[in-house]
Amino acid sequence: VRRFESWLASAGLGVTVKEFPQGTRTAVDAARAVGCDVGQIVKSLVFVAGGGPVVALVSGANRLDERKLAAVAGEPVTKADPEAARAATGYAIGGVPPFGHATEVPVYMDRDLLGHRVVWAAAGRPDSVFEIGPERLRELSNATVVDIKA
């Protein structure tokens, strides 16, 4: 299933997905496959805040501070289980893209991602990623840029 690529094509975004059979499930794996700094990898982390999903886009070099995410979300947060993550985004954990989700999901973006010329994010599967400028990522994901790193 290449649903995210179909979504990208229909949206006419001109973004190219790259596949890596060795996998891009973790930030380190993705950075190694792409040949970039781990800080340029976008981790799309799905949480539940007050019964609704939220997505945190975090630099691969950073750990998320769940208290900071809860503060910006305005509700306590818990990590989404695999079923909740798929229901909210349409994708399995390890391949969740930063936008193009199945439902309207609030997105919060780690400020550190803006410090890179380009970043790489999951493209719907645990073996594929795409390159994008961080400002364009913010715009397309409708993300609120915040300090959410630990």
Question: Where would I find each of the regions flagged by the language model?
Answer:
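Extended, low-hydrophobicity, polar/charged segments
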Residues: V1-A150
